[in-house]
């Protein structure tokens, strides 16, 4: 009887696939949210969730074990100090994959992978709203300055 395939191959050799997933995991730890293809996001989710579960132990052995895959000391420190502190009480499900529109060049399925508990801190809607308010203040301020300059010229 034919069994299902255990993982996506992503069109790469085993070593290249492992390196790709480790790099995506490192970038996810550093940036808390990354945009990639849907298949890579789903495979990265498997890798990063196992790493976070190991990191929750907080032992030196866990650090060394994770350092085999993530060769960035800054990312390891962030994982053990910030990420584990945020998701320490959660039993799995540390990340979410949000599907996006297809990529323009090749119509590949795109997705965002992010940490669940960091979504409020990096939501783009909040930053856009504040930038619109800042722009409105600048525009109003410039109109006042133009009026003041016009009056002084008279």
UniProtKB/Swiss-Prot annotation:
Source taxon at top rank: Bacteria
InterPro entries named among the record's database cross-references: Ribosomal_bL17, Ribosomal_bL17_CS, Ribosomal_bL17_sf
Residue segments, region Disordered: 125-154
One GO cellular component term noted in the UniProt record for this chain: cytosolic large ribosomal subunit
One of the GO biological process terms: translation
A single GO molecular function term of this UniProt record: structural constituent of ribosome
Keyword presence, Ribosomal protein: yes
One Pfam family per UniProt: Ribosomal_L17
Subunit composition and interactions: Part of the 50S ribosomal subunit. Contacts protein L32.
Family note: Belongs to the bacterial ribosomal protein bL17 family.
Official protein name in the record: Large ribosomal subunit protein bL17
Organism: Chlorobium chlorochromatii (strain CaD3)
Gene: rplQ
């Amino acid at each position: 009887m034919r069994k299902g395939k255990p993982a996506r191959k992503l069109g790469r050799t085993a070593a290249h696939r492992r390196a790709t997933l480790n790099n995506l995991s490192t970038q996810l730890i550093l940036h808390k949210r990354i945009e990639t293809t849907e298949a890579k996001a789903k495979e990265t989710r498997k890798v990063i969730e196992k790493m976070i579960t190991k990191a929750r132990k907080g032992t030196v052995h866990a650090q060394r074990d994770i350092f085999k895959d993530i060769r960035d000391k800054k990312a390891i420190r962030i994982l053990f100090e910030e990420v584990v502190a945020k998701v320490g009480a959660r039993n799995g499900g540390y990340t979410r994959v949000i599907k996006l529109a297809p990529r323009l060049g090749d119509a590949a399925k795109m997705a965002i992978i992010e940490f669940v508990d960091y979504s409020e801190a990096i939501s783009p809607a909040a930053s856009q709203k504040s930038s619109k308010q800042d722009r409105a203040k600048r525009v109003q301020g410039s109109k006042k300055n133009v009026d003041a300059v016009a009056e002084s010229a008279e």
